[in-house]
């Protein structure tokens, strides 16, 4: 009789382990949609390793500046690329660890172009004032 409860306890522990393992998802939800032609990064823009270029999505455009995000195959690294209009060499990109809510990275490029990449479900009330929310995941300084 003691083996039945032990088996049941083992099954419950395995189930709990599997369920908690699924709850730690780190990916950015905006990358879940199908890509469109506008999502393709310009050929002259590179993304740092370990980002997968094929995951790139255009999330916002402001004053002609395009904001792309991409992530690694395991979704633990997220990247932001800020691309000014035209074939400008002034683009910049960077990556950071996507381990939970909050700021993943802040980029500052030539000419003072700045942007922050946020993880999903970030609390904007805890961020420094003076930023404009372009999307759930991208902040830029107030004009």
What does each model-identified segment do?
Residues 49-51, 75, 143:
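Polar alpha-helical coiled-coil and adjacent low-complexity
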Residues 30-71:
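N-terminal secretory signal peptides
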Residues 18-21:
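C-terminal motif of bacterial Sec signal peptides marking the signal peptidase cleavage site
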